[in-house]
Amino acid sequence: MSGRSVRAETRSRAKDDIKKVMAAIERVRRWEKKWVTVGDTSLRIFKWVPVVDTKEKEKSKVSVGGEMQRKNFPSEESSDNACSVLLDFQDENSNQSSLSDSYQHKAAADSSNNSSPPASEPVSPAPQSLDYRTDDPQPPTLGQEIMEEPLLQSSEIADEPPTLIKEDLLPLTAQEDEDSCGAPPLKRICTEQVSVIQMVPLS
C-alpha cells in the first residue's frame, strides 16, 4: 500500500512540474527584445519585454493610456511602461524579469551618476599609465631592470617567428640520425623526409 501511494505522489509531482515547465515555455514564447524607456527619464534600454496579444494590448492601452494622458505623458511611453508593468506582474519569480529590472535600476543609476563627470574629465587610462612609466623621475633599481628585460625579450620573441638557418639544420639532422638508429624504419623515413623538405626551400 505504501509503495503505491509513494508512486502516486511522485506521479502527481511530476505532472505539476511538467505543467510549470510548459507554462514557463509558453511565457518565454511571448517575449521579445524592445527598446524600453526607463521610468520618467529619457534613458532607453534594450530588454526582454512580454509580447502582448492584440486584445490585451488594446485593454492595456485604454486603461494605462487614460491614466497617462491625465498625467500628460506621451502614448509611446505609456505602452512601454505598460509592458514593463506587465513584465513585473506576469513573471515575478523568473530570472529574466529580476535580471532586467536590476539592469534597469543599474542603468538608471549609472546614467544619473555618469551624466556630469564625462563632460569634465577626459577618460584615457592607457596613455596615462604609459606616460607615467616613461616620465618616472626615479631610476629603476638593479632588481627592476632585471625584471623588465625578460619581459621585453619574451615580447620580442612572441612578435617574430623563429627562422631556420642552414647551419642550425645540419646539427639537428645529425642528432636525429644518431637518435633514429634504434628507431623503427618508418620513423627514420619520416624524419629524413622532413629534413629534406626543410632544406629544399633554403637552398
Swiss-Prot record:
It comes from the Eukaryota. Residues 55-80, 94-148 are annotated as: Disordered. Belongs to the BCL7 family. It comes from Danio rerio (Zebrafish). InterPro entries: BCL7 (IPR006804). Residues 109-129 have a biased composition (Low complexity). Coiled coil: none annotated. PANTHER family: B-CELL CLL_LYMPHOMA 7 PROTEIN FAMILY MEMBER B, BCL7 RELATED. The lineage of its organism: Eukaryota, Metazoa, Chordata, Craniata, Vertebrata. Transmembrane segments: none annotated. It holds the Pfam family BCL_N. This is B-cell CLL/lymphoma 7 protein family member B-A.
